[in-house]
């Protein structure tokens, strides 16, 4: 039996909106597998569509560079927001981004080796760990970029207006699409969601045959919600991104989105515990 920690229960609550006891029970039944717990809770009606896992806890910056026919995003992490704004840290991060631009296709391993000496020296000077975490390239006829406070970086590749593609990049930053078009959603993802929706319908009392017919309509909505062109455009929710792109004669071929610290869980202590540690328990 996997250990059901308080942080795991907290994450499940944040992602489903369900109560603490329901979340703990679901995790116990799923042996600590949070994704399985979410699926089971959705099937039983305890949770609606769960929020995507995207715990942003680590600090740092996302930097973007655009070259001839390609763009690159680089993520560099540190431990605190204070250091993320430090001139030395930002200087090194910009050096890394410039190197990635000048050496298209470079790997994260190459970047780490190239800048290890400077990184180690900066760690010794500042007294805080830091690392180059990710580098991602995107090829395209036209590349647009959008950075949201150096915490979220988006590159959009396409054909047509750079200005319009930048608006789409802003949409990607806000709405987190996973695919470009509804038809790009993989069969595996569609089937996984279909089975969940069928179980939800059956658990609500619908016969299996009727449940399966009901779900087909829901699947079209689902693929639209997770794809860029199927989503409502944040700058004009009355139309989809796809319809907007057609109206401005612009096409999106691909995109990438990085957010600082995605998937990294930062250990947090409550205020009382922190005070106790500082005072040696003599608060």
Swiss-Prot record:
What does the UniProt keyword field contain?
Cytoplasm, Elongation factor, Protein biosynthesis
| Protein name stated in the entry | Elongation factor Ts
Q: Does the keyword Cytoplasm apply?
A: yes
| Involved in Mg(2+) ion dislocation from EF-Tu: region residues | 80-83
Q: Name one GO cellular component term.
A: cytoplasm
The gene name reads: tsf
Where is this gene product found? Cytoplasm
Molecular-function GO term, any one? translation elongation factor activity
HAMAP family for the chain: EF_Ts
Enumerate the CDD domains for this protein.
UBA_EF-Ts (cd14275)
**Pfam families in alphabetical order:** EF_TS
Tell me the organism: Actinobacillus pleuropneumoniae serotype 3 (strain JL03)
Question: Disulfide bonds, which pairs?
Answer: none
Q: What is this protein for, i.e. what is its function?
A: Associates with the EF-Tu.GDP complex and induces the exchange of GDP to GTP. It remains bound to the aminoacyl-tRNA.EF-Tu.GTP complex up to the GTP hydrolysis stage on the ribosome.
* InterPro entries, A to Z: EF-Ts_dimer_sf, Transl_elong_EFTs/EF1B, Transl_elong_EFTs/EF1B_dimer, Transl_elong_Ts_CS, UBA-like_sf
* Family according to the record: Belongs to the EF-Ts family.
Top-level taxon: Bacteria
Keyword presence, Iron: no
């Amino acid at each position: 039996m996997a250990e059901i920690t308080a942080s795991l229960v907290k994450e499940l609550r944040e992602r489903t909106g369900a109560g603490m006891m329901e979340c703990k029970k679901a995790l116990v039944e799923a042996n600590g597998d949070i994704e399985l717990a979410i699926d089971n809770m959705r099937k039983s009606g305890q949770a609606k569509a769960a929020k995507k896992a995207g715990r942003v806890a680590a600090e740092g910056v996302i930097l973007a560079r655009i070259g001839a026919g390609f763009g690159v995003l680089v993520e560099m992490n540190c431990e605190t927001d204070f250091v993320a704004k430090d001139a030395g840290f930002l200087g090194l991060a910009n050096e890394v981004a410039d190197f990635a631009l000048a050496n298209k296709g470079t790997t994260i391993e190459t970047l780490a080796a190239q800048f290890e000496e400077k990184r180690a020296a900066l760690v010794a000077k500042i007294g805080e760990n830091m690392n180059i975490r990710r580098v991602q390239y995107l090829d395209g006829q036209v590349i647009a970029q959008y950075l949201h406070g150096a915490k979220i970086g988006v590159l959009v590749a396409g054909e047509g207006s750079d200005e319009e593609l930048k608006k789409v990049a802003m949409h990607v930053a806000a709405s987190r699409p996973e695919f470009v078009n509804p038809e790009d959603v993989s069969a595996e993802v569609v089937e996984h969601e279909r089975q969940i929706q069928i179980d939800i319908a059956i658990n609500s009392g619908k016969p299996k045959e009727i449940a399966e017919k009901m779900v087909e309509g829901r699947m079209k909505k689902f693929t639209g919600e997770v794809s860029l062109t199927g989503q409502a455009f944040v700058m004009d929710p009355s139309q989809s991104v796809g319809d907007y792109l057609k109206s401005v004669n612009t096409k999106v071929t691909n995109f990438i989105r990085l957010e600082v610290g995605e998937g990294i869980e930062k250990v947090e202590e409550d205020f009382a515990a922190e005070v106790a540690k500082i005072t040696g328990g003599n608060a």
